[in-house]
């Protein structure tokens, strides 16, 4: 029972770190937004809702390359303590500025997201330090005493358990409803923060970044994190065997 508890805690902690690594890696690629843009038919969404926007005009006249650039700037800003959010603007095909992209409420929300990333970074760095110390102790114990304080389970068993856990979580999301889970998470993470829900008619941000897009991004992050987790598990197992 003790070994199962230790193994579970270590696996979950390592996966949390891998989720952060996945976020950073995919941020560097802008989450392959050019592919997601096509998958979610965001151009059609912009054509439908941008003309209805009550705050900003003529976004429907912009090109897909402009939409992808704006997404990249948003990702860059929220990974940089929110710097530059207010300056994000959209331009017509001649390079003339039309307007700033974000409203004040949207900027506040994205700054809240940025603060969450900073807080998450601090947690992950602390967790990484703890895991290095724990695994270092296990290695030292094995080398100095020629026996195990804790021996890792096989990579196949560990992988199977993690995949099973992720399948259960996925099933839970489908039962509750992806949209409802999305809203619950926002209510928990941004309680007592600025506005986080925006109607299409009031927000170019929501028009460009519909809720369904974040579902795809969540899947990408999870798959990427699982790959990192498997690689790190193999390395750790080789060291501690």
Task: Give residue ranges: language-model regions.
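Hydrophobic secretory-pathway targeting helix
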Residues: 1-33
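Juxtamembrane interface at the cytosolic side of transmembrane helices
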Residues: 1-12, 127-182, 230-241
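Alpha-helical membrane-inserting segments
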Residues: 18, 22, 26, 169, ...
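Long, solvent-exposed extracytoplasmic domains/loops
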Residues: 33-113
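Alpha-helical membrane-embedding segments
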Residues: 65-80, 187-188, 192, 215-231
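Short, aromatic-rich amphipathic segments at membrane interfaces
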Residues: 101-121, 202-215
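Juxtamembrane non-transmembrane "cap" segments at the membrane-aqueous interface
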Residues: 175-200
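Terminal transmembrane helical module of multi-pass membrane proteins
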Residues: 193-241
């Amino acid at each position: 029972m003790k070994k199962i508890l230790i193994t579970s805690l270590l696996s979950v902690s390592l996966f949390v770190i891998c989720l952060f690594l996945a976020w950073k890696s995919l941020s560097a690629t802008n989450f392959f937004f050019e592919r997601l843009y096509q998958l979610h038919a965001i151009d059609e969404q912009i054509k439908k809702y941008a003309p209805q926007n009550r705050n900003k005009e003529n976004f429907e006249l912009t090109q897909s390359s402009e939409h992808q650039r704006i997404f990249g700037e948003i990702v860059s800003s929220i990974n940089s303590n929110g710097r530059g959010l207010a300056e994000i603007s959209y331009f017509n095909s001649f390079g003339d500025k039309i307007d700033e992209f974000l409203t004040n409420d949207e900027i506040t929300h994205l700054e809240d997201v940025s603060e969450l990333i900073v807080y998450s970074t601090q947690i992950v760095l602390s967790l990484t330090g703890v895991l290095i110390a724990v695994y270092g102790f296990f290695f030292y114990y094995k080398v100095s005493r020629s026996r195990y304080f804790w021996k890792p389970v096989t990579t196949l068993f560990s992988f199977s358990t993690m995949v099973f856990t992720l399948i259960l979580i996925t099933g839970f999301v489908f039962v509750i409803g992806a949209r409802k889970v999305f809203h619950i998470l926002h209510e928990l993470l941004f309680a007592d923060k600025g506005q986080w829900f925006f109607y299409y008619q009031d927000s170019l941000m929501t028009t460009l970044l519909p809720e369904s897009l974040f579902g795809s991004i969540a899947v990408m992050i999870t798959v990427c994190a699982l790959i990192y987790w498997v690689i790190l598990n193999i390395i750790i197992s080789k060291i501690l065997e």
